[in-house]
Amino acid sequence: MDSDDCYSVIQDLSATTDKALIRKLQQAISLWKNALLTPEQALNIAKDENEAQAARLYRNYVATLTSYQAVDFDDLIRLPVELFRTDEAARDRWQRKLRYLLLDEYQDTNTCQYEMVKLLVTGPGKKPMFTAVGDDDQAIYAWRGASMENLRTLQTDFPDLKLIKLEQNYRSSTRILQAANAVIGNNPKLFEKALWSEHGAGDPVNVLAMEDDEAEADQVAMMLSAHKFERRAKFSDYAILYRGNHQSRSIEKALRRERIPYVMSGGQSFFERAEIKDIVSYLRLIANADDDPAFIRAVTTPRRGGGLPSS
């Protein structure tokens, strides 16, 4: 089940239409699953009645997914972890399939993912053979359960770990690295690093403080247009990088006003497209007739003219 399906289940179980509350409950359940906490454990550590109610809803949520014979995204790692903890034959079979393991963005792993790693690379008479790539200065997913402590505990859990620092930067100029180091200089450090580059000093970094995202987008579009005219460049020589997709709308509007042609890279996920979710709902219903969210989507899409009787 995707995020929207899970949202619908929680909405039905909580009997509320408060979108913010439903998202908060969805986030709480996800964090508990990623921390490998059962509904009972979540209830035991609840700090107040609101958390206790969320934990009880978590229990009903798990029961509902079980009745649908469905899993959510968090279960895709949590359930294999539970399997490997209790079934040595299954764990051994998968260990033999994996001779080497490469883990990227390790600073953004959560408790469940770290447990999966340990279950796959450790065991009686087994020498761990894996590579973990991570940067403590790039940890940005604590809000969804990621823990930078996983980098620290690696050295404790695997004392023979060999540390290799990749300090040469192949992407940026010296000025960009200096600016980045100034921003992250006060961060708590697990590993001291001295980044350097062979690309020379590079152009100065310009920082503009704008009133809002609309003003920022307008300024970017005007600067791009002026720079192209001065340098007699092509529009294809330019790229605009932004932090999140929520910023794309204002940037697109500004580019259109300046009559700047552009191509969007990325965009909506294939499986998030409405027509794809419609087809998948039919397939899910064929596989499991008790999948209520799939039934509701299938029976209402496309519109068939059915509805409440008119007076």
Regions found by a protein language model. Give the residues of each.
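Conserved P-loop NTPase-based nucleic-acid remodeling module centered on helicase motor cores
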Residues: 1-28, 40-49, 56, 60, ...
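Conserved P-loop NTPase motor "coupling/switch" region that bridges the ATPase
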Residues: 4, 149-167
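Short, well-structured alpha-helical segments
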Residues: 22-33, 51, 55, 74, ...
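Accessory helical subdomains and C-terminal extensions of nucleic-acid helicases
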Residues: 31, 42-47, 95, 126-128, ...
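Conserved helicase C-terminal RecA-like lobe
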Residues: 47, 100, 248-260, 273, ...
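Conserved helicase NTPase motor core
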Residues: 47-153, 168-172
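Short alpha-helix plus adjacent loop in nuclease-associated cores
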Residues: 137-142, 171-172, 264-287, 299
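Helicase P-loop NTPase motor core
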Residues: 159-162, 167-261, 284-288
